[in-house]
From Swiss-Prot:
The gene is ruvA. It is found in: Cytoplasm. Belongs to the RuvA family. The RuvA-RuvB-RuvC complex processes Holliday junction (HJ) DNA during genetic recombination and DNA repair, while the RuvA-RuvB complex plays an important role in the rescue of blocked DNA replication forks via replication fork reversal (RFR). RuvA specifically binds to HJ cruciform DNA, conferring on it an open structure. The RuvB hexamer acts as an ATP-dependent pump, pulling dsDNA into and through the RuvAB complex. HJ branch migration allows RuvC to scan DNA until it finds its consensus sequence, where it cleaves and resolves the cruciform DNA. One of its GO terms (molecular function) is ATP binding. Homotetramer. Forms an RuvA(8)-RuvB(12)-Holliday junction (HJ) complex. HJ DNA is sandwiched between 2 RuvA tetramers; dsDNA enters through RuvA and exits via RuvB. An RuvB hexamer assembles on each DNA strand where it exits the tetramer. Each RuvB hexamer is contacted by two RuvA subunits (via domain III) on 2 adjacent RuvB subunits; this complex drives branch migration. In the full resolvosome a probable DNA-RuvA(4)-RuvB(12)-RuvC(2) complex forms which resolves the HJ. It comes from Pseudomonas fluorescens (strain SBW25). HAMAP family: DNA_HJ_migration_RuvA. It comes from the Bacteria. SMART domains: HhH1. Its main location: cytoplasm. The lineage of its organism: Bacteria, Pseudomonadati, Pseudomonadota, Gammaproteobacteria, Pseudomonadales. This is Holliday junction branch migration complex subunit RuvA. Keywords: Cytoplasm, DNA damage, DNA recombination, DNA repair, DNA-binding.
Length: 203
């Protein structure tokens, strides 16, 4: 089991990234809440990881903190929740928001996540309620950075394209993803910030 990796952030292609560890490139899939907190490409970073071994693939998931990684592990223990749905939940809502939704048994918070209908949301909330009693809600660890410098047109188009691709990978329909990104008025955002704003608009 690979529990943690420390290296240089080599590539970011939401929701995937490449982490260079002593010349070996590890491809990881990360939730958007981790993507928002990543440093620039070329910077060092430590990620907590979870490895899923299948007959046809070995999939590595990365998280900015151990708490997020442990939360992911709690989610995939639930009946009918695989890594894809767990990442969609953690990308649409921060860990503390999910904990609050479970505490309040708020189905509406979960049904806005692609792939989660009312019955699924109700079942998840019931199953999670006892599991999450020990989870403490803490202040948000990150926020959107305002007043970013203008980006060249080519970078804007690339950021928008990356944001749309990331939303589609989370389960949103291409039309929904494109509409959500197009609705963002500030075009001088990175792909990570575009994804975050688009998700807030959808939820």
């Amino acid at each position: 089991m690979i529990g943690r990796l420390r290296g240089t952030l080599a590539e970011k292609q939401p929701p995937h990234l490449i982490l260079d560890v002593n010349g070996l490139g590890y491809e990881l899939e990360v939730p958007m809440t981790t993507l928002y907190r990543l440093p620039s490409v070329g910077e060092p970073i430590t990620l907590h990881t979870h490895l899923v071994v299948r007959e046809d693939a070995q999939l590595l998931y990365g998280f900015i903190g151990k708490r997020d990684r442990d939360f992911f592990r709690e989610l995939i223990r639930l009946n009918g929740v695989g890594p894809k749905l767990a990442l969609a939940l953690m990308s649409s809502l921060e860990v503390d928001e999910l904990v609050r939704a479970v505490s309040a048994q708020d189905t509406s918070a979960l049904t806005k996540v692609p792939g989660v209908g009312k019955k699924t949301a109700e079942r998840l909330l019931v199953e999670l309620k006892d599991r999450f009693k020990a989870w403490e809600v803490v202040p948000s660890m990150f926020a959107l950075v305002p007043n970013q410098p203008d980006m060249p047109a080519g970078q804007v188009a690339s950021a928008e394209s990356d944001a749309v691709s990331a939303l589609i990978s989370l389960g949103y329909k291409p039309q929904e993803a494109s509409k959500a990104v197009s609705a963002i008025k500030d075009k001088n955002l990175s792909s990570e910030d575009m994804i975050r704003r688009a998700l807030k608009g959808m939820i």
